[in-house]
Regions:
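Solvent-exposed, non-transmembrane regions of membrane-associated and secreted proteins
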Residues: 3-244
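C-terminal accessory segment of soluble enzyme catalytic cores
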Residues: 1-3, 278-279
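C-terminal single-pass membrane-anchor helix
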Residues: 234-281
């Protein structure tokens, strides 16, 4: 009876360990499916808009950005600018667009604000900074978590180098930015996030060092002309998540086989021992 209990305990321990090992991959896969669906829904809703709708949304965003550019303290007092939540909210879900970083295989919906609920599953637009629609004297800041066991998000943002590009899609615009500055600052240091007169910037922000999170990694991009080949390319979550969902069970299979072989060997050894005792008596 004691041996049977030991076997059951070992099996339970194994499956608990297997669940712990698979959790990050499976959870990330579910999150990426959610992100992909959110982007697809956004794109479908955008396709239904008329040219007049596009113009109205962009005019509202440009007017908002003009207010941000005119206020040097906008980042510290975002409540000064009413109407933020509704500007560019085409779907009514808070999504204003999506960001694609091909080098690290990331495509994330961009939501209004940087609440923890947003940053757990997607990218958030930092309130008090320019909306990401481009234009002179704009500087949008997009933030996402790093190192979550449930989602990759900006985990690999540190792999970007000066000269790499990323795109932001808002309504029918695909805006391309080339990384021109990478810096690490304290959370209280915000000078690198302010609007620069005449410049069109987007900064990607996440915590660093990995797992410690005492500083902020800022990856700034300057606006460049979008190449035709990038205007219709999407790095979907489905495309980049197939591999982990397949490889995780493959990695777990050897452990399962080892356990099964051990159980089989132990059972045979016990039977053999019992047989020898029976012959002795």
């Amino acid at each position: 009876m004691k041996k049977n209990k030991s076997t059951i305990i070992l099996i339970l321990v194994f499956f608990v360990g297997l669940s712990v090992m698979l959790y990050p991959t499976l959870s990330d896969y579910v999150n990426q499916r959610h992100q992909s669906h959110a982007v697809a829904t956004y794109s479908a809703d955008v396709d239904k808009l008329s040219d007049a709708d596009y113009s109205a949304y962009f005019e509202a965003a440009d007017a908002f950005n003009a207010q941000i550019a005119a206020d040097p303290d906008a980042l510290y007092f975002p409540d000064r600018f009413p109407g933020y939540e509704s500007t560019l909210d085409v779907t009514g879900t808070g999504i204003m667009g999506y960001i694609t970083i091909s080098k690290i295989g990331v495509e994330l919906p961009i939501y209004h604000g940087t609440s923890d609920g947003v940053l757990q599953v997607a990218a958030g637009h930092l309130e008090g900074t320019s909306l990401p629609v481009g234009g002179a004297s704009t500087h949008a800041v997009i933030s996402a978590h790093r190192g979550l066991p449930s989602a990759k998000l900006f985990t690999n943002l540190d792999q970007l180098e000066v000269g790499d590009t990323f795109t932001i899609t808002v309504l029918d615009r695909v805006l391309t930015y080339e990384v021109d500055q990478i810096s690490i600052v304290l959370p209280t240091e915000t000078d690198n996030l302010k609007v620069v007169d005449g410049k069109d910037y987007v900064t990607l922000m996440t915590c660093t060092p990995y797992g410690i999170n005492t500083h902020r990694l800022l990856v700034r991009g300057r606006r460049i002309t979008t190449p035709d080949k990038l205007k219709h390319i999407r790095v979907t979550a489905d495309a980049i998540k197939i591999e982990p969902i397949i490889t995780a069970p493959i990695m777990a299979l050897p452990l399962l086989l080892v356990l099964l072989l051990w159980l089989l060997f132990s059972n045979r050894k016990r039977k053999s021992t019992r047989g020898e005792k029976h012959e002795t008596h």
